[in-house]
């Protein structure tokens, strides 16, 4: 199944066209064969009446006149029938039985018996021109003069079957009548699709697919613009409002997206203003409190209040840093991940605390500073708990994956997701407020990626950063 909307619509259209053309062709072919069979049976009845009239005429002639009449007919070029007198019925290989053949033979026999009498002895069969025998079986059709039989029994370039009727009209005297079926029913084979009709069906289907493809391409352009705008919004890149035009459904989607975009921008601006105000409002009373603490005479109490104020200030700075790190206003650029990793790991390469393996085949389209902060947070976390870290870069057609492995104690399985929560610490005595991994995951999300955790079998923790390549350009 194609992945694109255009490919799927073309495939569904092709299937629909094939089914429709197949059903219509079957219906048309069934109707055509029914009409052909009806016309064939009517022509057979008319031909049988003509045969019966010819037999009656020859039966009425005196015995001596019959050969003379046949000679005169041949000298005049013959009639629609080839007629001869034989002393016995000729044996010829008949054509295989088919429904049309059996129906024609039954009608011819019924008409002849009806006209000539039930007691008349006759044989009716269809024979191929190559198997046809004439004049007591001594001659083939090709051995006769063309004026004698070819007019009545051949139809070039078609090689239609010959209806041979042999009727006993006297002692050792059989009247031999051979004829083609009347046009256009010279063949007993059921009518099929002609090459011109097949070409017409193929041409119509291709034309319909072409127009459907053009229509879907035209209609899918607003969807592509919407997808591009959604990616820009996810990456924080500035983008203009979508044009609200096209089909009513597309206009409604574009309008809803523009409204959502405006609300998100307004929310981010209000959040920035709010945290700026909080930063200003909190630092002033904290500074005031520090001054008052210094005026205390009790040193023990002064130290206690100082620790609380340090913790409060660290909390405020951490919260502001979290907002700052996850709200990076950068344009998307081509980032050389190999160079970026070397730059981040350079301070630790000399003492062997960090090892970098693997390379990216192509630059990655993303935000340079945000990616640097994301990978830096992952590396700092690994060195903090494991002292050593290994950065493994894997590049593929769909995504770039960076594994950060450490030699630390690992994380309990039930707490793997809790690590990303702000202010979560595995050890109550640990320093900081657990914002690094959460910030890294948020930056990964803005690039359409993900950060996942997994305990290594040999010990330590593996943090995997997956950044998709598709759809980010």
From Swiss-Prot:
Topology within the bilayer: Multi-pass membrane protein
Protein keywords: ATP-binding, Cell inner membrane, Cell membrane, Kinase, Membrane, Nucleotide-binding, Phosphoprotein, Transferase, Transmembrane, Transmembrane helix, Two-component regulatory system
Stored Gene3D superfamilies: 1.10.287.130, HAMP domain in histidine kinase, Histidine kinase-like ATPase, C-terminal domain
Regions of this protein lying in the Cytoplasmic compartment: 1-8, 219-473
Domain HAMP intervals: 217-269
GO annotation, cellular component aspect: plasma membrane
Chief location of this protein within or outside the cell: membrane
SUPFAM superfamilies for this protein: ATPase domain of HSP90 chaperone/DNA topoisomerase II/histidine kinase, HAMP domain-like, Homodimeric domain of signal transducing histidine kinase
GO molecular function terms noted in the UniProt entry: ATP binding; phosphorelay sensor kinase activity
Induction of synthesis: Induced during infection of airway epithelial cells.
Record note on disruption phenotype: Inactivation of the gene results in elevated ingestion and reduced cytotoxicity of eukaryotic cells during P.aeruginosa infection.
CDD domains, A to Z: HAMP, HATPase, HisKA
The Histidine kinase domain, residue ranges: 277-471
Catalytic activity: ATP + protein L-histidine = ADP + protein N-phospho-L-histidine
Periplasmic side: 30-197
Phosphohistidine: modified positions: 280
Transmembrane portions of the chain: 9-29, 198-218
PANTHER family reported for this sequence: SENSOR HISTIDINE KINASE ENVZ, SENSOR PROTEIN CREC
Role of this protein: Member of the two-component regulatory system GtrS/GltR involved in the regulation of glucose metabolism and transport, as well as regulation of the exotoxin A gene expression. GtrS recognizes and binds 2-ketogluconate and 6-phosphogluconate via its sensor domain, which accelerates GtrS autophosphorylation and concomitant transphosphorylation and regulation of the response regulator GltR.
UniProt name for this protein: Sensor histidine kinase GtrS
Species per Swiss-Prot/TrEMBL record: Pseudomonas aeruginosa (strain ATCC 15692 / DSM 22644 / CIP 104116 / JCM 14847 / LMG 12228 / 1C / PRS 101 / PAO1)
């Amino acid at each position: 199944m194609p992945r694109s909307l255009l490919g799927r619509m073309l495939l569904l259209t092709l299937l629909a066209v094939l089914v429709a053309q197949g059903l219509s062709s079957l219906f048309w072919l069934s109707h055509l064969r029914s009409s052909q069979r009806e016309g064939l049976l009517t022509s057979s009845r008319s031909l049988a009446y003509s045969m019966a009239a010819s037999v009656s005429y020859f039966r009425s002639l005196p015995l001596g006149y019959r050969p003379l009449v046949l000679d005169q007919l041949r000298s005049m070029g013959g009639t629609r029938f080839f007629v001869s007198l034989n002393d016995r019925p000729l044996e010829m290989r008949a054509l295989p039985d088919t429904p049309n053949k059996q129906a024609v033979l039954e009608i011819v026999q019924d008409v002849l018996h009806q006209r000539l009498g039930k007691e008349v002895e006759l044989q009716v069969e269809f024979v191929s021109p190559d198997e046809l025998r004439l004049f007591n079986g001594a001659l083939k059709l090709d051995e006769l003069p063309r004026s004698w039989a070819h007019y009545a029994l051949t139809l070039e370039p078609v090689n239609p079957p010959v209806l041979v009727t042999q009727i006993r009209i006297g002692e050792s005297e059989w009247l031999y009548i051979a004829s083609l079926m009347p046009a256009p029913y010279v063949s007993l084979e059921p009518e099929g699709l002609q090459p011109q009709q097949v070409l017409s069906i193929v041409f119509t289907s291709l034309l319909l697919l072409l127009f459907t493809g053009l229509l879907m391409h035209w209609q899918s352009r607003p969807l592509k613009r919407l997808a591009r705008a959604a990616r820009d919004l996810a990456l924080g890149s500035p983008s203009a409002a979508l044009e609200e035009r096209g089909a009513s459904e597309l206009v409604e989607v574009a309008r809803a997206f523009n409204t959502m975009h405006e609300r998100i921008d307004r929310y981010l601006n209000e959040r920035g203003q709010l945290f700026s105000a909080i930063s200003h409002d909190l630092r002033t009373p904290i500074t005031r409190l520090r001054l008052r603490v210094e005026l205390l005479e009790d040193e023990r109490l002064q130290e206690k209040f100082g620790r609380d104020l340090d913790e409060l200030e660290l909390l405020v700075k951490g919260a502001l840093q979290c907002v700052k790190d996850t709200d990076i206003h950068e344009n998307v650029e081509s980032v050389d991940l190999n160079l970026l990793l070397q730059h981040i790991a350079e301070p630790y390469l000399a003492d062997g605390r960090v090892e970098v393996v693997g390379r990216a085949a192509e630059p990655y389209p993303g935000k340079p500073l945000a990616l640097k902060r994301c990978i830096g947070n992952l590396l700092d976390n690994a060195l903090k708990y494991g002292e050593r870290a290994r950065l493994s870069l894997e590049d593929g057609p769909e995504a770039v994956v960076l594994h950060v492995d450490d030699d630390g104690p690992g994380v309990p399985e039930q707490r793997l997701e809790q690590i990303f929560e702000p202010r979560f610490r595995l050890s109550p005595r640990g320093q900081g407020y657990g914002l690094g991994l959460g910030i890294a995951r948020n930056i990964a999300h803005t690039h359409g990626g993900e950060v996942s955790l997994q305990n290594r079998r040999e010990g330590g923790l593996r943090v995997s950063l997956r950044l998709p390549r598709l759809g980010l350009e």
